[in-house]
């Protein structure tokens, strides 16, 4: 693998053997490309039809008024610059969006009243503002109201035509009833189905069924056309006194026993005798000879056949029989032929009768029987029938029925198959319509019914609806497009009405349009759609996975309850497209999936996966992306098929996939091969080393739990990785990458300034400033913090990681820590997956994480007067105000705990009647305390921490307090510093370029002290101030022009810099847009350090999870022979039954990696003593093996080598890619290299007694994660608190500060103990006896211990409910009763 800059600083030993010819595509490409297509569809010179915003406008416009005297046309659209950038939107709780301006043209016509001819009277064009269009951030998310959201892609059934059967469930006989459904992208569904009697029916929009011939009549076919479309015609000719002559099809008699002699019409020879079986050999002989073409059939054989065409008396025009009628022969008792339609035809001199080729074996009479049952005979009655079904209760007229039928399937505004639907239909029915033909055609419907009838006759196969060729992905762009179309259609109605009601000559397009519905549709989609989700921002992996998620739920999709097993199951076509492992446990299993690593979505919305081409057993490097449908035609080998040096298959038989089946195929038949073994799984699953040794259920848990890992204080990359960590860190946007190559100019914790050396354009300052995100709060309250990785003077390349983000370490994803674990029980503290940890872990902050809580308070304008944020709060002592500044807002850096005031706020309260005591107090102490109450923002119970940031927002025109002004000053200083730095680098750059241009040239004139025609030298330039260099006029015309251009560019750049600075400062100083009624808002961010403690949940990467049971002092933990205590004790019983053996291999491999790292450490110490590099080179060569050493390390200079060695002293990192990683032999080999025993087990000693344990223990280094289920967030206690209004019982749950439920079973327990008084308290005074609660409070205050329980409030609720049922239930007092 190619080494990146950081990859050289910390080399990973790569165990993969399969060469990858294709880099993994950008992981958030799905989101970005889809939305780009939606927004920028109008950039093409010729606008593409039907794509993106432009497509939506083209489909809705032009809008005509009702009289068609004016028309509103769409011309073009443009997105302006967004008002605020992403960061400002997040701080101000705004949506990151850009104003959308649409150019519309209003054309007014003059209509000549006599001729009705139109002439253009007036044309007006105008730009109209159509609301704000949300923009996507560079990381593929949207900022909506200040929070980051992700739009999840949706899987839905592809538009097109599908054939299916009911699996024999509908009818008791178990007969298969076939059905066909045409699903459009939008519009009415059309179903065709068989019933148990083999009659074909049609349904529109799942309504009442109609005979399918009714639909065909409505399309303008008559009986003859229908019969012609579905059946072949054969002609029966009458031979005098012999019978009928008909064509002979030898194939059809194979294997049958004829009921009459089969006689050759030409020779009269009996081919097959009656009742004797026809052998295949005899049939083959007949076909080969090809002589017999016609058979002679008995006269009565024509009975039961159906006429193919209307047979008419040429002279009178009378119809003998109609197409589809049955031919009959009637006999009297003694067998004499007396009548029937066939006899009538013969009697009338008709000797050739065209009949339908129905033999009831290969071709059934279904369509003919349907036609016979259908009471309609022509188009008009058929249309009326359809009208009655679609609009029951309305009197049908032919015109209305015809109009309705046309709008159902043939009107592009109401019905849209979409390009996908048309392509799918063409493929399934072998049609050749253009994919711009988006409505149905007559041929399509006829072909669908034909295919359905063929299925019933046993030809063709039904479709598999879970096949990925029949399911497609709707990504952000498309979902947004549909939503915007809905908004525009709402708007269209209003526009039409306005065009008809106003004086059209005087208005402009602006006056006709109210953009509210369109903007509202967009806002509603981003705010409340099921697919617009709060981004999972726990760590970089969870962000990436969230953006790559595919959901089958959501509008137009499935619901959890209705989704069966088949939809959720893994399908062969998922291979390389959707991950078979990563899906949630629980009700959503299989409905929410993840895109595989190499997969991409094509323009039709189908998921494609890459394959390498194979030609004549030779694997080429040509890569081809294929959708599931295309792949069905190929034979695909697996990536691990053995190849020789030339890239040919070694074996004659190769394991392959052919149309969904796994088979061994000859290698010459193979035409494709997988690109990589990891193309099967998703990003999260491909981060699990030794995945191939884990059970699938545990792998599922492993990939899901990695997403819940909390970023730790100090990230540490895994020793045993898979080599994909770097890709995730890069694509997630957590780490910062250099946009272009350059040299580091300045670095501090806040920002990196790079002087660019490549991609320089003329008008470019050549400065890139990267700001770090420092201690920002993520959606999940984890901490986002970025740290620079580079030093001043470093050279960086484009795309290189220059700063680490949360959970990244030197540009690699680092979700947890490498710790020493022992698989052994320890005094029962590992029972049921509990985990025992060493005190070192807690002491050294190994698993400590920072969490940031946001507190917000708003001062509103109330009816009684404005609320006020102040330090002057009634009845609060100075001690409680110690952390507040003069404005009443907490200082940054203050340590706060539950109940502390963060922001002081007072609210005016109304006059309430006063008790005498209060009157006395007011008389003594004056007015102030009475008219306001304390509504300060206080810290919630259970939250401790340090204030890290405060933001103050003021309404326009409200005077700013001291704190707001201070924050503003700091912000402006920061912006000025940025501007000055950029200016300094710009100056340096420009003057360097100027100097190189003018040095050594001759100046015609210059500033004071420069003689005419002097040569410009270094000394001369030193003497002049830099600003005066511009005044040196050069003799050479060309050089003078260059200097002129440079000067102009310099001025432009300075102006741009100043303008940008002014704009930013203006935004900082401007008031904020706050919700109505809010005068001022303060946000306080409190950071908490959470150490690892009992009750926290931890997990490995293999689905091995557990809860910490105890923290043991370091000296009591089991220790190794060299005195190293282990960090974690895990239960060995957690492995066998769960079958996730990958964790054991990881432990061994980690142990070997650590051992090799220690060897390097010793060599480094030797180097520091002696200054000799040889031991370091030897140790690295030993650790990495000769090949890696020769390729990557041998050529390093001393400084780089020592840095590289220093980075691996804690363990040599290795990469073992999924399905292509280290085998058991490699693990043994690594253990031996590191100087350990092959078993991977060590002798351990008990820390408490110092004695050796009875047998060797598996000890190793394992990567463990701390999950986002922290005991601090879950533990909760309450004495008194809020009560429910109706039942007066305490609320439930930590969020409501609720109580613990004493439920039915707990009551039984107290009953069983006979604890009557405890039980009474539980059910009354501790719960919902309002009077009792008060009495208890009083007695506690007075120091007494007697109280009595009253009636629980819930009993009163019950009484009221019974009264609501009309029963007057009363509670009688016992004394009164007597």
From Swiss-Prot:
Q: Kindly state one GO CC term assigned in the UniProt record.
A: DNA-directed RNA polymerase complex
Which chemical reaction does it catalyze?
RNA(n) + a ribonucleoside 5'-triphosphate = RNA(n+1) + diphosphate
| Keyword Transferase on entry | yes
Against PROSITE patterns, the record matches this protein to:
RNA_POL_BETA (PS01166)
EC number, UniProt record:
2.7.7.6
Q: Which family does it belong to?
A: Belongs to the RNA polymerase beta chain family.
Assembly and interactions? The RNAP catalytic core consists of 2 alpha, 1 beta, 1 beta' and 1 omega subunit. When a sigma factor is associated with the core the holoenzyme is formed, which can initiate transcription.
Q: What is this protein called?
A: DNA-directed RNA polymerase subunit beta
| Organism per entry | Roseobacter denitrificans (strain ATCC 33942 / OCh 114) (Erythrobacter sp. (strain OCh 114))
